[in-house]
């Protein structure tokens, strides 16, 4: 058989095999189009489980007459126009395949009217070449899509459809998921002429809880713990059921959304399951309704044909962020259910060519805003529902990379393995008693030694040893405690009874060193460390520190600071001249005693006179 271009109808039917799985798939695609069009009310009429009729009517912005034919064509969309748009998707749809695919396996009619038009227009495609016919019609502002006789021309696909009740249950579940994603939209679902579901648009917190209860049931609402967790461009909101009271009926409630898009993501589910594992039985599953907001540049939604899955650029970071957010709420075990607070999202700039994608909360026309200041890492030490100082996760102006570079680099350094510094050697000869400087750095020798010249003498200085002494000085508290730096992702570790007792005994001293933690029955959560430790592999260093403390009978801040300084990893495997000069300046400022009385292993004089005499004799 020769190579040939497939006719449009056959090509669309092949694409429909990926997008249109069953009537519920059609409903999902069409309702998402309505939401992208800025609709605040969507009516869904179903007959015979969707096999006979699917009608979606909305009050969105509508489609212009000139664009109706394009709306039914493949790869035609108003939602993206360039590769930059594809890398930062803000609408629910973007491929431009749904209408063409659906029309190829059904009798589809599209009727629409914009506010600028005096009359509505109707379009439908038919024939082998999918030619589009457009004619005038009567219709208010908005769009109506009618899908008749789904799979009428693909008998094999129609055989795989289940009973009318089963197919409608799938449609009902899709509408439930959409209703949880968009509290601001009224959704009416009818089956065979009877109104089955009616979700009215809500705005206030109490009304949101009523919709949550109507969809998920009163038992879930009674056990729901509200989550409000943020760091930088990552925000986690929603509800998770108290695992101590989770029943089998609640385990079916597992809804997660990424930037408003309903999702079935294994990474998110694993993070939630891991946070609840200490409180859940072996055969139990967590129940949750969670909303993750993230910079669109940091997530790829162009992965699954039906857009059920996403791929995070910083998957481990997202996993641990969700894990800590859920864990913090479960640890507090608040008795009252806290509603999500209405927080006005920061205005988001939408490129002009994408305004047609809709006026929903993913595409709010915005005024120019000032550059956003870096967000302070947020970690919860009080109530989970508080949002003091919270910034909106919105406002991604054509997507500048958010946390990817600075925080991502910090996170990647956590995967490095520290090396132990060498033991001190005998004390080196002291410099001139009146000296305030090690001298001038001439060059770097062997990658980790600085060749110094001072008062006509030449010496080698060990940069790792100098760095260790500097770090010890930075960690040793003076008149005030060392400043604690909140961790990007708090570190949770399992500890023994002896280790927990040692930590509690040394907690005040560790606090002076800038190490803050909370402990429960079998775990300790490190929430802050001093600045010199931010770049360290804390997953190795902290357990070793806990083991060291468990072996001690008495504690002193100087000894703890000395142990930490000896066991941290150098930030400079290969030193440069600039780094050496900067290090020595800090050592001379913070450790002036090292200049007057250098400890062993720091300085080694170089005997130039012997070398010069040897050259003269030759």
Curated annotation (Swiss-Prot):
Gene Ontology biological process: mismatch repair
Alphabetized UniProt keyword annotations: DNA damage, DNA repair
UniProt biased composition (Low complexity): 366-381
Residue ranges, annotated region (Disordered): 366-405
Keyword field contains DNA damage: yes
GO molecular function: ATP binding; ATP hydrolysis activity; ATP-dependent DNA damage sensor activity; mismatched DNA binding
Record-linked InterPro entries: DNA_mismatch_repair_CS, DNA_mismatch_repair_MutL, DNA_mismatch_S5_2-like, HATPase_C_sf, MutL/Mlh/PMS, MutL/Mlh/Pms-like, MutL_C, MutL_C_dimsub
Keyword presence, Isomerase: no
One of the Pfam families matching this protein, by short name: MutL_C
UniProt biased composition (Gly residues): 382-392
GO CC, alphabetical: mismatch repair complex
NCBIfam families: mutl, PRK00095.1-1
Family membership: Belongs to the DNA mismatch repair MutL/HexB family.
Function: This protein is involved in the repair of mismatches in DNA. It is required for dam-dependent methyl-directed DNA mismatch repair. May act as a 'molecular matchmaker', a protein that promotes the formation of a stable complex between two or more DNA-binding proteins in an ATP-dependent manner without itself being part of a final effector complex.
HAMAP family attached to this UniProt entry: DNA_mis_repair
Name this protein carries in UniProt: DNA mismatch repair protein MutL
Species whose genome carries this gene: Salmonella agona (strain SL483)
């Amino acid at each position: 058989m020769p190579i040939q271009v497939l006719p449009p109808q056959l090509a669309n039917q092949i694409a429909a095999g990926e997008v249109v799985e069953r009537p519920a798939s059609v409903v999902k695609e069409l309702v998402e189009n309505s939401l992208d069009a800025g609709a605040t009310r969507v009516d869904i009429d179903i007959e015979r489980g969707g096999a006979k009729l699917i009608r979606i009517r909305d009050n969105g912005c509508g489609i212009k007459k000139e664009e109706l034919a394009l709306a039914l064509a493949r790869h035609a969309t108003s939602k993206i126009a360039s590769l930059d748009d594809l890398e930062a998707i803000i609408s629910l749809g973007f491929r431009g395949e749904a209408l063409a695919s659906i029309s190829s396996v059904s009798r589809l009619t599209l009727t629409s009217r914009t506010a600028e038009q005096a009359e509505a227009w109707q379009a439908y495609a038919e024939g082998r070449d999918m030619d589009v016919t457009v004619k005038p019609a009567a219709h208010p502002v908005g769009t109506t899509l009618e899908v008749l006789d789904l799979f009428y021309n693909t008998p094999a696909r129609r055989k795989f459809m289940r009973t009318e009740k089963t197919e409608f249950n799938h449609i009902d579940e899709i509408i439930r998921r959409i209703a949880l994603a968009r509290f601001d939209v009224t959704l009416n679902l009818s089956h065979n002429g009877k109104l089955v579901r009616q979700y009215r648009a809500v705005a206030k917190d109490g009304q949101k809880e009523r919709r949550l209860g109507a969809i998920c049931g009163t038992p879930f609402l009674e056990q729901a713990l509200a989550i409000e967790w943020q760091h930088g461009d990552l925000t986690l909101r929603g509800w998770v059921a108290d695992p101590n009271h989770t029943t089998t009926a609640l385990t079916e409630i597992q809804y997660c959304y990424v930037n408003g898009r309903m999702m079935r993501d294994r990474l998110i589910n694993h993070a939630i399951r891991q946070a609840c594992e200490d409180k859940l039985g072996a055969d139990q599953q967590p129940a949750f309704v969670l909303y993750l907001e993230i910079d669109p540049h940091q997530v790829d939604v162009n992965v699954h044909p039906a857009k059920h899955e996403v791929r995070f650029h910083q998957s481990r970071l997202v996993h641990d962020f969700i894990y800590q957010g859920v864990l913090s709420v479960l640890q507090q075990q608040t008795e009252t259910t806290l509603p999500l607070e209405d927080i006005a999202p920061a205005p988001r700039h939408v490129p002009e060519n994408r305004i047609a994608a809709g006026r929903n909360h993913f595409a709010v026309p915005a005024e120019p805003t000032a550059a956003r200041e870096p967000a302070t890492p947020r970690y919860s030490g009080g109530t989970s529902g508080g949002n003091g100082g919270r910034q909106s996760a919105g406002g991604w102006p054509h997507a500048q990379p958010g946390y990817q570079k600075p925080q991502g680099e910090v996170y990647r350094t956590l995967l490095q393995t520290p090396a132990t510094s060498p033991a001190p050697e005998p004390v080196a000869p002291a410099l001139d008693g009146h000296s305030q400087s090690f001298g001038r750095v001439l060059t770097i020798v062997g990658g980790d030694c600085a060749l110094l010249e001072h008062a006509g003498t030449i010496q080698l200085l060990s940069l790792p040893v100098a760095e260790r002494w500097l770090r010890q000085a930075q960690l040793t508290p003076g008149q005030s405690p060392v400043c604690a730096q909140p961790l990007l992702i708090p570190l949770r570790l399992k500890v023994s009874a002896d280790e927990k007792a040692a930590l509690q005994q040394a907690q005040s001293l560790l606090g002076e060193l800038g190490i803050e933690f909370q402990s429960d029955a079998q775990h300790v959560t490190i929430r802050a460390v001093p600045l010199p430790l931010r770049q360290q592999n804390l997953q190795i260093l902290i357990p070793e520190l806990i083991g060291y403390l468990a072996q001690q009978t008495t504690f002193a801040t100087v000894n703890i600071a000395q142990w930490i300084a000896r066991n941290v990893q150098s930030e400079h495997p290969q030193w440069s001249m600039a780094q050496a000069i900067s290090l020595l300046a800090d050592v001379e400022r913070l450790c002036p005693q090292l200049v007057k009385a250098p400890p062993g292993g720091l300085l080694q004089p170089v005997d130039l006179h012997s070398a010069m005499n040897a050259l003269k004799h030759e």
